[in-house]
């Protein structure tokens, strides 16, 4: 009888000691440019940040229209879930929402796959191809790591980078947006390590 009790106690202690360690990082979706109707244009990735920092969705408005979403790892410890913070910068209005669990900053629309322009059903213009995404990152010139995919060699000039025409936004405007988001402390951009 005592042997059964001892085995039972050892089993319980074994289960209690063998629990998986709690992760000390949060994993979030990362998309530097998401159009509400096209999905993630810049290539979707993931980012990690130490707890208790949040995942974030930053909605960018032009006048009263939602123009873009930026998804990534948040930086402000003062943000509480469901709080919204509004920041005005140039002609854009930024609204930041945070959440406190892995991948909680989910997509607002289905993520489309790149297709050849001119193919049936491509009237909306699809997200950038792999080589265009690489050029997009280079054109922003923010020392961002390249997305995790294999692409064809990118041409030297950035003139061939064509964002979907429905965006109505230049690379210079995008760069200004990302520099503001990073310098304001809203978003942790994944800087490339030397």
From Swiss-Prot:
Glycan attachment positions: 63, 141
UniProt signal peptide: 1-18
Mod. after translation: N-glycosylated.
Domain UPAR/Ly6 span(s) in chain numbering: 26-118
UniProt xrefs under InterPro entries: LY6_UPA_recep-like (IPR016054), LY6G5B (IPR038773)
Disulphide linkage map: 28-55, 31-40, 47-73, 81-98, 99-104
Alphabetic keyword roster: Disulfide bond, Glycoprotein, Secreted, Signal
Compartment(s) where it occurs, according to its Swiss-Prot or TrEMBL record: Secreted
Gene Ontology CC terms, in alphabetical order: external side of plasma membrane; extracellular region; protein-containing complex
Entry-linked PANTHER family: LYMPHOCYTE ANTIGEN 6 COMPLEX LOCUS PROTEIN G5B
Quaternary structure (record): Monomer.
Protein name, as recorded: Lymphocyte antigen 6 complex locus protein G5b
Organism: Mus musculus
The gene coding this protein: Ly6g5b
């Amino acid at each position: 009888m005592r042997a059964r009790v001892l085995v039972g106690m050892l089993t319980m202690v074994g289960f209690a000691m063998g629990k998986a360690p709690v992760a000390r990082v949060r994993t979030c979706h990362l998309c530097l440019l998401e159009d509400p109707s096209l999905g993630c244009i810049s290539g979707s990735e993931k980012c990690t940040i130490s707890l208790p920092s949040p995942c974030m969705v930053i909605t960018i408005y032009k006048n009263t229209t939602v123009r873009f979403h930026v998804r990534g790892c948040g930086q402000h410890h003062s943000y509480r879930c469901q709080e919204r913070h509004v920041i005005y910068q140039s002609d854009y209005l930024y609204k930041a929402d945070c959440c406190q669990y892995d991948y909680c900053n989910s997509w607002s629309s289905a993520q489309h796959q790149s297709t050849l322009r001119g193919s049936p059903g491509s009237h909306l213009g699809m997200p950038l191809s792999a080589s265009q995404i690489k050029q997009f990152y280079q054109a922003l010139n923010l020392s961002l790591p390249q997305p995790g995919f294999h692409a064809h060699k990118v041409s030297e000039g950035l003139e061939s980078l064509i964002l979907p025409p429905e965006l109505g936004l230049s690379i210079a405007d995008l760069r200004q947006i990302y520099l503001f988001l990073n310098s304001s402390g809203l978003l942790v951009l994944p800087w490339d390590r030397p």
